[in-house]
Amino acid sequence: MAKIVDIKGREVLDSRGNPTVEADVILEGGIVGSACAPSGASTGSREALELRDGDKSRYLGKGVLKAVANINGPIRDLLLGKDATDQQALDRAMIELDGTENKAKLGANAILAVSLAAAKAAAQAKGVPLYAHIADLNGTPGVYSMPVPMMNIINGGEHADNNVDIQEFMVQPVGAKNFADALRMGAEIFHHLKAVLKARGLNTAVGDEGGFAPNLASNEDALAAIAEAVANAGYKLGDDVTLALDCASSEFFKDGKYDLEGEGKVFDAAGFADYLAGLTQRYPIISIEDGMDESDWAGWKVLTDKIGAKVQLVGDDLFVTNTKILKRGIDEKIGNSILIKFNQIGSLTETLEAIQMAKAAGFTAVISHRSGETEDSTIADLAVGTAAGQIKTGSLCRSDRVSKYNQLLRIEEQLGGKAPYKGRAEFRG
């Protein structure tokens, strides 16, 4: 038994300079597992609650001392003496103690930090890497794959102070022979994109996730700049590299319309579905996240019927890593993929349940960071340990993003051929 003898919480900073929660779970024998909770900017209304203090005299009200106190008090008291390797029992106990639908009492940030720290401590106690422990918890021991990275190299929307409405423009090195090759390709494209933007006299400052954040004439202008960078890097768009979008449509859905302020265009759901379909015809876009508002299920149905057979349609704000909401999407044939974010649901156990439900229904599962991140690289191990096949963890700069890529390099080196990189086969169409 990997007996928990102490739990400690603390307030640390995320990549935006805002407080977040870190937890240590300490086992008999001195083993320590540590984990941080991430934080989002464009958040779904149905996400589990991130508990913040609201005290304007500290960190502009964003302090997390209440969540930390919950770790050091009731959560610690609850879990002392328990077995860290029994992840389900730990998570269920915390969920039951909280007693709310959205973890509003203890805070999803408090519960998640402890949940992940316990998993890390348990992996050490077993003498295995974290990804191997996660595979065991997932019921798929020894089954691994290296994820295709979806690299966010132009930022807009809530992730940047520019006029671009679509939040993320991503490249996917689907033609790479392994993850290390994919990372190199992405980095080369990133540097060529900087040169393309500089040549156009555009800003090359980066946004929250490390992508460039220039003002552009249109969303399509961003795609054209990326296409030029891909070609300049010596790769063939559509073969070596494909494209993906995160529209984060809930951020520009106003009064029942999709309002692209940067382009001066307003669409109803059918019109916006046509707009997105047009982009997929002109560019090799094989994945679109949050193409409709989180509450516009009718719009999602229109989009799914129009392009869902050939394009991965990912629900982020729509599904919020929640199996109850995902089940509705599966039953109604809304979308065909789920974005997986630990802190939307607030525990490792519930995260694994969402991945399992998605895969059983033929949906893909994309493991994702948040725009407010730390050096914690747990999502890299989650992607490999669940053989999810895809990961979103930002651009090719900022160590809060690169820490995940570097962990994936280490894992690929450890596993060798036991973790295949499947490239284009991970996607639809």
Swiss-Prot record:
Q: Which residues form the active site?
A: 209, 341
Q: What Pfam families does the database record attribute to this sequence?
A: Enolase_C, Enolase_N
In the UniProt record, does the keyword Membrane occur?
no
Q: Recorded E.C. number(s)?
A: 4.2.1.11
Known role: Catalyzes the reversible conversion of 2-phosphoglycerate (2-PG) into phosphoenolpyruvate (PEP). It is essential for the degradation of carbohydrates via glycolysis.
| UniProt lineage | Bacteria, Pseudomonadati, Pseudomonadota, Gammaproteobacteria, Pseudomonadales
Residues that, per the record, bind (2R)-2-phosphoglycerate: 167, 341, 370-371, 392
Oligomer status and interactors: Component of the RNA degradosome, a multiprotein complex involved in RNA processing and mRNA degradation.
Report what the protein is called: Enolase
Q: Where in the cell is it found?
A: Cytoplasm; Secreted; Cell surface
Which NCBIfam families does the UniProt entry name for this protein? eno
This protein's major location comes to cytoplasm
Q: Which cofactor does it need?
A: Mg(2+)
Q: Give the matching Gene3D superfamilies.
A: Enolase-like C-terminal domain, Enolase-like, N-terminal domain
Source organism per entry reads Ectopseudomonas mendocina (strain ymp)
Cofactor comment text: Binds a second Mg(2+) ion via substrate during catalysis.
Listed under catalytic activity are: (2R)-2-phosphoglycerate = phosphoenolpyruvate + H2O
